[in-house]
């Protein structure tokens, strides 16, 4: 095994930023893994909420893309990618749509907090490129995602979820089923 040679392209890229990017990559991959678990839970024959499954599968792919974008940045800046083990989701049974949406909301807020801390680190290390990258590619999208999930949680509660199975069915069919046409 060869040791990594020093980068020719590295400039104004602090080691703390490099390490924080590697941690963010892991967090984005973890989020992707959680959403993948949610997707296939809702795809089960005894749950059968196909639009919840599609929604969470889409979220999983987005989180993986976020990780890949950070990997590309790491290479562009002359950093080195060090992947860590991805923690398994805290549960395998997501119980119902409301619970899954609440967990997703909590997850997105955690990812957002980590991005805000990464932005602060980049500011402290006087790295305008990293600040701009995070602002351009992540922060606005996180805020939109948090708002969307918050709206979903509110609407599911208003419809009587989780006590009413009909609420989840209607939400799956009419809200998530029509989301392909919006975005």
From Swiss-Prot:
Fe cation 2 binds at residues 63, 108, 142. The keyword Transferase does not apply. It catalyses: 4 Fe(2+) + O2 + 4 H(+) = 4 Fe(3+) + 2 H2O. GO terms for cellular component: autophagosome; cytoplasm; cytoplasmic vesicle; lysosome. The modification Phosphoserine is found at residues 179, 183. The modification N-acetylthreonine is found at residue 2. It is found in: Cytoplasm; Lysosome; Cytoplasmic vesicle, Autophagosome. One of its GO terms (biological process) is intracellular iron ion homeostasis. Its EC number is 1.16.3.1. GO terms for molecular function: ferric iron binding; ferrous iron binding; ferroxidase activity. PROSITE patterns: FERRITIN_1, FERRITIN_2, FERRITIN_LIKE. Residues 11-160 form the Ferritin-like diiron domain. The modification N-acetylmethionine is found at residue 1. Keywords: Acetylation, Cytoplasm, Cytoplasmic vesicle, Iron, Iron storage, Lysosome, Metal-binding, Oxidoreductase, Phosphoprotein. It is an enzyme of class 1 (oxidoreductase). Fe cation 1 binds at residues 28, 63, 66. Oligomer of 24 subunits. There are two types of subunits: L (light) chain and H (heavy) chain. The major chain can be light or heavy, depending on the species and tissue type. The functional molecule forms a roughly spherical shell with a diameter of 12 nm and contains a central cavity into which the insoluble mineral iron core is deposited. Interacts with NCOA4; NCOA4 promotes targeting of the iron-binding ferritin complex to autolysosomes following starvation or iron depletion. Belongs to the ferritin family. Stores iron in a soluble, non-toxic, readily available form. Important for iron homeostasis. Has ferroxidase activity. Iron is taken up in the ferrous form and deposited as ferric hydroxides after oxidation. Also plays a role in delivery of iron to cells. Mediates iron uptake in capsule cells of the developing kidney. Delivery to lysosomes is mediated by the cargo receptor NCOA4 for autophagic degradation and release of iron. This is Ferritin heavy chain. It comes from Canis lupus familiaris (Dog). The lineage of its organism: Eukaryota, Metazoa, Chordata, Craniata, Vertebrata. The gene is FTH1.
